From Swiss-Prot:
Keyword tags: Aminoacyl-tRNA synthetase, ATP-binding, Cytoplasm, Ligase, Nucleotide-binding, Protein biosynthesis
Top EC class of this enzyme: ligase
Reaction(s) the record says it catalyses: tRNA(Arg) + L-arginine + ATP = L-arginyl-tRNA(Arg) + AMP + diphosphate
Quaternary assembly: Monomer.
PROSITE patterns in UniProt: AA_TRNA_LIGASE_I
UniProt protein name: Arginine--tRNA ligase
Protein location: Cytoplasm
Cross-referenced InterPro entries: aa-tRNA-synth_I_CS, Arg-tRNA-ligase, Arg-tRNA-synth_N, Arg-tRNA-synth_N_sf, ArgRS_core, DALR_anticod-bd, Rossmann-like_a/b/a_fold, tRNAsynth_Ia_anticodon-bd
Lineage start: Bacteria, Bacillati, Cyanobacteriota, Cyanophyceae, Oscillatoriophycideae
Keyword Ribonucleoprotein on entry: no
Source organism of the structure: Microcystis aeruginosa (strain NIES-843 / IAM M-2473)
GO CC annotations, alphabetized: cytoplasm
Record EC number: 6.1.1.19
Main location: cytoplasm
Length: 585
């Protein structure tokens, strides 16, 4: 199904050509959703921007457009408002036809991408020998949501986990473990990840304070990089231990990822330097090899270079990221590469992308996007920390969310004097708890910081996961109470939209394709959350104002269709956020 806004655009594009000639065939008619329902459903703003070019008043341009506009089957008579806006109100008969098409459409009107693209989404990316913390939450959840939406649109998506599995920290850790716990370097599972993290912190202190230790650690890195068998075995054991712990969290959150860590690109680093040199882009600065960039300066206003090879001959994150771009473009054949990391890395990626374009690693037909996000804050407005000032571990945060959800559920069951099985309580608490964490993050504009609050995210009122899940469960309760299987409703039955609440709900249901298209373009998942929240509110108003099971036919079946379409839209939308629905709560 073509999105409603796209259908309207096509009609106005035809009118532009009829009214003002073929020169206007590619002119965007500037159709937007109406800012206020009092003015209709959509608005055309092209008259104001064309007036100067056509040397006419905006209202005259609007009148000419309407004269040649064929839109009677979609809209009521358009109205010219203010200086030249054209207000459009959809016809109930058109809404009924469009909704009828959705009844047998599993995709609920969302078309598949044409053409489909090969897209890489790079997200999560924790560091080996460190536990995942709250900072990884946003990258993991936002990246997964973006990947789900692109996959639903039938793009070919590669989900990559660019784990930090290489570098000086391994020489440091291996050197320390050789002294303190040598069995960890030869035996699988000799340590758990928490112990590894503790040893890593101690190793870092030794590295910073003990010159002999620092030199031994550097030699250990050289041995590792040169392929020394014992060093490689120790490194692989450390990676495997971390990997197993990461996977536990990915399984809990239902995250699918292909690991391709920093070490994967080691064989390609020297070739990157060679290509940059061949193109005359390298400059030596204090023994390091750099690329000077346009528009980047330090505090003194001096040109700021991107270092790609350190003075000691080692490589850095920039070199690895350039090698990754080369591989993703040349081997993966990616047409769009999306990096989901915190906003603090914006400058780094801007520099890397510029070098990649200068060097020809990034052709014009490949888009690279940094999906930046803000911080997770505590209720004190500061970066979320434990009481002791430590970074909050992601596993502990998720466990606490489930515990809070369980406490809320048990309290509600007691107040309702309801008895449920242990399995029901455990599953519901886990689903609601984890969904609340995901939704609280995704419902925020990712550019902003947000305050993490269990109380707010688990609230049954407001823009929260429990509110959405409850709206879905409420529809299913109609099915149970009426002994109705929505799938048994005849697709040949009529859809009748008379009540204002029905019309408002119908219009919201039909906006899903526009919303999915917008999120695919601007990569802002909160748009989908906002849509689902509005849908839930409009359904609740419909439920309050329009009897369903007590209505006479054919109104009853028509309203049952609206209920079913609402439930299906909520289920689909929530699944794209990585949230499963519950039939009962």
């Amino acid at each position: 199904m073509t999105a409603i806004i796209q259908q309207i655009k096509e009609r106005f594009s035809q009118s532009l050509v009829k009214s003002f000639g073929e020169n206007f065939a590619d002119t965007d008619p500037l159709i937007v959703a109406a800012s206020n329902p009092r003015f209709g459903d959509y608005q055309c703003n092209i008259s104001l921007s064309l007036a100067k070019e056509l040397k006419q008043k905006p209202r005259e341009v609007a009148a000419t457009l309407l004269k040649n506009l064929e839109i009677d089957d979609l809209c009521q008579t358009p109205e010219i408002a203010g200086p030249g806006f054209i207000n459009l109100t959809l016809k109930p008969s058109y809404l009924e036809t469009q909704l009828k098409d959705l009844i047998t459409d599993n995709r609920l009107g969302v078309a598949t991408a044409n053409p489909s693209q090969k897209i890489i989404v790079d997200f999560s990316s924790p560091n080996i020998a460190k536990e995942m913390h709250v900072g990884h939450l946003r990258s993991t959840i936002i990246g997964d949501c973006i990947a789900r939406i692109l996959e639903f649109r039938h793009h070919q998506v590669i989900r990559l986990n660019h784990v930090g599995d290489w570098g000086t920290q391994f020489g440091m850790l291996i050197t320390y473990l050789q002294e303190a716990y040598p069995s960890a370097l030869t035996q699988a599972d000799a340590l758990d990840l928490g112990d590894l993290v503790s040893f890593y912190k101690k190793a870092k202190i030794r590295f910073d304070e003990d010159e002999n230790f620092k030199e031994t650690a550097r030699q250990a890195v050289v041995k590792l990089q040169s392929g020394d068998p014992q060093s490689r075995q120790a490194w692989q054991l450390l990676c495997q231990q971390s990997r197993r712990e990461f996977q536990k969290i990915y399984d809990i959150l239902d995250i699918k990822l292909t690991e391709r860590g920093e070490s994967f690109y080691n064989p390609y680093l020297e070739a990157v330097i060679r290509e940059l040199d061949q193109q005359g882009l390298l400059t030596e600065d204090n023994g390091a090899l750099c690329v000077f960039l346009d528009g980047f300066t330090n505090k003194e206003g001096e040109p700021l270079p991107l270092i790609v090879k350190k003075s000691d001959g080692g490589y850095n994150y920039a070199t690895t990221d350039l090698a990754a771009i080369c591989y993703r473009v040349r081997e993966d054949k990616a047409e769009r590469i999306i990096y989901v990391t915190d906003a603090g890395q914006a400058n780094h990626f801007a520099q890397v992308f510029q070098v990649a374009k200068k060097a020809g690693f990034l052709p014009d037909n490949v888009a690279v996007v940094h999906v930046a996000f803000g911080l997770v804050l505590g209720e004190d407005g500061k970066k979320l920390k434990t009481r002791s000032g430590e970074t909050v571990k992601l596993q502990e945060l998720l466990d606490q969310a489930i515990a809070c959800s369980l406490a809320d559920l048990e309290k509600r069951l007691a107040s309702e004097e309801r008895e449920e099985t242990g399995d029901f309580i455990a599953k519901t608490a886990e689903t609601v708890g984890l969904s609340a964490v995901k939704y609280a993050d995704l419902s925020q504009n990712r550019h902003s910081n947000y305050v993490f609050s269990y109380d707010k995210m688990l609230n049954l009122q407001g823009n929260t996961a429990p509110y959405m899940l409850y709206a879905y469960a409420r529809v299913q309760s109609i099915s149970r109470e009426g002994g109705i299987n929505f799938q048994d409703l005849s697709a040949n039955s009529s859809l009748i939209l008379k009540d204002e609440s029905e019309l408002i709900l119908a219009k919201q249901l039909l906006q899903l394709p526009e919303v999915i298209s917008a999120v695919e373009e601007d990569l802002l998942p909160n748009r989908l959350c906002d849509y689902l929240y509005e849908l839930s509110k409009k359904y609740n108003r419909f439920y309050e104002n329009c009897p369903v099971l007590k209505a006479a036919e054919p109104i009853k079946t028509s309203r049952l269709f609206l209920c079913d379409l609402t439930a299906r839209t909520l289920k689909l939308g929530l699944s794209l956020l990585g949230i499963p629905v519950l039939e009962r709560m």
